[in-house]
């Protein structure tokens, strides 16, 4: 026999057997892992851990949070996986106050609803019953069943419930800086003074004449003008392109706006 390395088969057999045992153990571990995962998967979907346990609502002011949760259908027991969230969002957006809704899953069992509402710019007095109803920045008016409110920071509006320019006024109030809006306690439309004439009563004690057209731009300068006047002095403050103060029984006085 030629010189060469002789392979001892008997020595190799134990190595082959050990390799086969290791492969068998690995397959067994893999099968057990797959089975365990499958059982956990089935258990998860059969248990409460796969259902909604809590719903958080953010962004609501006029809409009741409880109503949002109930209308969304996201009650206890609803699946975190199969519930049609887009349908819940569409249902909520039927409410006249709501602009948009975003739903977010927060594992393991929580849902967060982010609600964006239209802004209330004033409270409109009804000529029919004298009640006040919220006027939104899109020009729509809410009835008592469509909102909740504990305080009124926006101006009261009278004589505008049947006016064709109500939507324009709502837009102008929305454009006006909130710091100025909060100083207006009441807005009164007086048609005998003009179709677009408005009389404002402010928290500073002034009576202001202005118009619906360019209301926001005209009233933006109000704080700078009011600080130059004595609220105890009787008269009318005209807030138009060029503001001036009309003292009672005296000539008009133009007011220079300080930058």
UniProtKB/Swiss-Prot annotation:
**UniProt-annotated location(s):** Cell membrane
Q: How does it sit in the membrane?
A: Single-pass type II membrane protein
Its principal location?
membrane
Cellular component terms (Gene Ontology): cell division site; plasma membrane
Q: Which stretches of this protein does UniProt put in the Cytoplasmic compartment?
A: 1-27
- Its job: Cell division protein that may be involved in stabilizing or promoting the assembly of the division complex.
Biological classification of the source = Bacteria, Bacillati, Bacillota, Bacilli, Bacillales
User: Which BP terms does GO give this entry?
Assistant: FtsZ-dependent cytokinesis
Instruction: Please report the name of this protein according to its UniProt entry.
Output: Cell division protein DivIB
Q: What HAMAP family does its record include?
A: DivIB (MF_00912)
Family note:
Belongs to the FtsQ/DivIB family. DivIB subfamily.
* Organism name: Bacillus selenitireducens (strain ATCC 700615 / DSM 15326 / MLS10)
Residues exposed to the Extracellular side: 46-259
InterPro entries the record matches? Cell_div_FtsQ/DivIB_C (IPR005548), DivIB (IPR026580), FtsQ_DivIB (IPR050487), POTRA (IPR034746), POTRA_FtsQ_type (IPR013685)
Entries under Pfam families matching the protein = FtsQ_DivIB_C, POTRA_1
| Segments passing through the bilayer | 28-45
Q: Which keywords, in A-to-Z order, does the entry hold? A: Cell cycle, Cell division, Cell membrane, Membrane, Transmembrane, Transmembrane helix
Every copy of the POTRA domain together lies at 50-118
């Amino acid at each position: 026999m030629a010189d060469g390395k002789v392979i001892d088969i008997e020595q190799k057999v134990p190595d082959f057997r050990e390799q086969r045992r290791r492969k068998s153990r690995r397959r067994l571990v893999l099968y057990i892992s797959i089975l365990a995962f499958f059982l956990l998967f089935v258990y998860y979907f059969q248990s409460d851990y796969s259902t909604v346990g809590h719903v958080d609502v953010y962004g609501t002011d006029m809409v009741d949070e409880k109503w949002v949760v109930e209308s969304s259908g996201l009650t206890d027991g609803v699946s975190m996986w199969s519930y049609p969230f887009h349908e819940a969002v569409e249902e909520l957006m039927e409410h006249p106050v709501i602009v948009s809704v975003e739903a977010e899953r927060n594992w393991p069992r929580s849902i967060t609803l982010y609600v964006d509402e239209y802004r209330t710019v004033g409270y409109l007095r009804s000529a029919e019953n004298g009640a006040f109803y919220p006027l939104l920045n899109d020009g729509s008016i809410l009835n008592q069943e469509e909102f909740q409110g504990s305080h009124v920071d926006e101006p009261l509006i009278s004589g505008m419930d049947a006016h064709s320019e109500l939507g324009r006024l709502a837009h102008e109030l929305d454009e006006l800086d909130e710091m100025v809006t909060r100083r207006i306690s009441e807005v009164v439309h007086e048609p005998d003074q003009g179709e677009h004439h408005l009389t404002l009563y402010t928290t500073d004690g002034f009576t202001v004449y202005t118009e619906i057209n360019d209301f926001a731009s005209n009233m933006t300068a109000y704080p700078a003008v009011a600080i130059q006047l004595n609220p105890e002095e009787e008269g009318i403050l005209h807030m138009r392109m060029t503001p001036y103060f009309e003292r009672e029984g005296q000539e008009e006085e133009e007011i220079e706006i300080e930058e």
